[in-house]
């Protein structure tokens, strides 16, 4: 554990889930008459998919520019519905990279040499055994679909603190406490 690939997978998958849920939360709370269509008996993802293209553009313009824009095919619910496809690993990776590309102007970082680092990248190539890539992607989506961060948005909860603690625990032990020495663990804070 705790290699660079594990770090990328954990942070990107949790960030994807966070952004998916944040996007839904913002849509449902948007100051727009269209938002009412997303809070009924139908799941918001289905209602969002059923909006016309113009309605989707209008409601997207009503939410904060601090939230990446997602299309219906980017949503976790859409991935969940495609799990039985044999090339699910490709579908998963394409979804991640498409979100990154469509939001690159705002949600990417740059190196000192002006190279853009995307929000997401293909994750299944980190699985060495190609036959295990689709099952790996299915397992990730299985974990993501059954919980929601929406309650955390109203409470301003820092969910990344637990992930950060997991990632640095071995470094602090094996490295003599030099990494993240100024970080206060969530349990103490």
Enumerate the predicted regions with their spans.
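Non-catalytic, mostly N-terminal accessory regions of nucleic-acid modification and defense proteins
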Residues: 1-188
């Amino acid at each position: 554990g705790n290699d660079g690939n594990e770090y990328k997978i954990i942070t990107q998958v949790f960030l994807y889930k966070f952004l998916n849920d944040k996007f839904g939360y913002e849509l449902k709370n948007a100051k727009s008459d269209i938002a009412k269509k997303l809070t009924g008996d139908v799941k918001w993802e289905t209602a969002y998919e059923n909006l016309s293209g113009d309605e989707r553009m209008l409601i997207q313009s009503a939410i904060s520019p601090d939230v990446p824009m997602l299309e219906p095919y980017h949503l976790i619910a859409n991935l969940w519905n495609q799990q039985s496809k044999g090339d699910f690993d490709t579908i998963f990776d394409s979804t991640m990279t498409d979100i990154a590309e469509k939001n690159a102007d705002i949600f990417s970082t740059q190196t000192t040499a002006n190279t853009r680092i995307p929000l997401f990248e293909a994750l299944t190539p980190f699985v060495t055994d190609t036959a295990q890539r689709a099952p790996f992607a299915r397992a990730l989506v299985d974990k993501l679909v059954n919980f929601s961060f929406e309650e955390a948005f109203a409470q301003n909860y820092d969910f990344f603190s637990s992930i950060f603690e997991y990632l640095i625990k071995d470094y602090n032990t094996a490295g003599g406490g030099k990494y993240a020495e100024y970080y206060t663990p969530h349990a103490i804070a």
